Design a protein with these regions (language model features):
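N-terminal export signals and maturation junctions of secreted/periplasmic proteins
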Residues: 1-5
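Short, contiguous alpha-helical
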Residues: 8-19, 29-81, 124-170
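A structural signal for well-ordered alpha-helices, especially hydrophobic packing surfaces
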Residues: 22, 52, 106-109, 113, ...
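A generic alpha-helix structural signal
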Residues: 22, 45, 99-102
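Membrane-proximal, proline-rich intrinsically disordered regions
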Residues: 25-26
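Acidic/histidine-rich alpha-helical segments that form the ligand environment
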Residues: 78-123, 140-147
């Protein structure tokens, strides 16, 4: 396997876990306010998808699908990647509509990954505007994007548990 094959497999796994975890979420469950300051399931779902869309767009130098394909308007949702606790807790969505955006984002990510070379993974990418300086593309993909998807999918699984639901799909 090449490094790109490994990345595509890792993202495929993360996407599989996410999709399996959210497959049975209803609108009521997605928009349920958990105790404390935790973000609702629907807000977590949208954050995972929009963050991946945004980061792949940034790394590829292309506009996000959110902008270029009008997903914000289609879904009637604001920008999603960095919401305050208050904004996340006020967020409402229809998870079945987010699934269409999910399919587009995951296909776009796989297309981006399949076009990379091993050398591209070492290319520094400037994240100074985020307070992180330059970081290799491969590190951004593994620590930021994969980490974000797995971490928030875990939160969704735990939040499902608080509703008496099975979390992960196994």
């Amino acid at each position: 396997m090449t490094a790109i094959d490994v990345l595509r497999s890792a993202f495929g796994g993360a996407h599989h876990w996410y999709q399996g975890t959210v497959a049975d979420i209803t609108a009521d469950q997605a928009n349920h306010l958990p105790p404390g300051i935790a973000h609702p399931i629907g807000s977590q779902m949208a954050h995972i998808l929009h963050s991946e869309d945004m980061m792949v767009g940034m790394l590829s130098g292309a506009p996000t699908l959110w902008e270029s394909q009008g997903w914000g308007q289609k879904l009637g949702l604001p920008m999603l990647s960095s919401q305050t606790t208050e904004g996340s807790r006020a967020f409402h969505c229809d998870p079945s509509q987010l699934n269409d955006y999910c399919q587009a984002v995951f296909a776009h990510t796989d297309g981006y990954l399949s076009g990379l070379s091993a050398e591209d993974l070492d290319r520094p990418f400037d994240l100074s505007s985020w307070g992180m300086g330059a970081m290799p593309v491969g590190q951004i993909l593994t620590t930021m994007l994969l980490g974000n998807t797995y971490a928030h999918t875990g939160e969704i699984s735990a939040l499902k548990g608080t509703l008496g639901l099975k979390g992960y799909p196994f």
